[in-house]
Amino acid sequence: MNTEFLKNTFSKVIKDYDTARPGYPKELYDKVMSFSGIGKDAAVLEVGAGTGQATDLFLQGDFRFDLLEVSEEQVLFLKQKYGNNPKVTVVKDYFEQYETEKKYDLIYSATAFHWVDSWVGYPKAWEMLNTGGTLAVFWHMSSVTYYEGGIFDGLNALKKKFLPGESLGFDAEGILKVKERRVAQIQSGGCFGAPEIYEYRWTDTYDAERYVTLLNTYSGTQTLSEEKRQRYLEEVRKYIVVNGGRVELPQHVMLYLVRK
């Protein structure tokens, strides 16, 4: 599947993404703050701001923000959301191509840096940071994790029916390999050392409607034809309704922190 196509699928489902995707825990923000030590008016860059879920968390700090996004739709959404905040600037550009004389005290990316070529992205982040500056990259893992038992068995069966070529997700060993790969990518180019890694877990309760909305934000779902996508979502909705009406979805976020 074309990477550019997958990057831009999210611009089609902005409102669904903002409604249904899980946010990030305050503990993550607190850890980034304690690690970075940044203070008022620090220069902060967010790579791949999406709908601003992580932005909302970091805005509790009195910093100066540049938000980077690639699609016109998402840039417009962010400008409408933060247009009245004089400390927020929204920029339409790819991180690999982004040029500025500015140096940053913190660069962070929330479930987005995998879209950036690691051999370009991590050395570029190093160059864009002030000495002592922090890079914080973190990802939600629930969308790529294999869950089984209970309601998940039926959800997995429906996914195999409509998306037979798509993985059901990583098991514990697979998640560990993802972690190891990301550590290696952070160190690619010989700039950053080994990151500090922190993990956050909780459980979200989704009713049928919100779970279907979440499912609609996944790039695999968006590759389906309109007719097939609607049938898939409707079958999932009906399945959840007749099986208790809710999904207890484990959430898992991995945070990687490095300093220049």
Regions found by a protein language model. Give the residues of each.
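Tryptophan-centric aromatic hotspots in well-structured domains and transmembrane helices
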Residues: K12, Y17, Y24, K31, ...
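A short SAM/SAH-binding and catalytic strip from SAM-dependent methyltransferases
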Residues: D105-V120, M141
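Class I SAM-dependent methyltransferase SAM/SAH-binding core
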Residues: A43-L45, G50-Y98
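Conserved class I S-adenosyl-L-methionine
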Residues: M1-G39
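A short acidic, Gly/Pro-enriched loop at the edge of an enzyme's catalytic core
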Residues: Q97-I107
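A short glycine-rich, Lys/Arg-flanked "PGG" loop and its adjoining helix->strand segment in the class I
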Residues: V120-G133
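Conserved Class I S-adenosyl-L-methionine
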Residues: T51, A172-K260
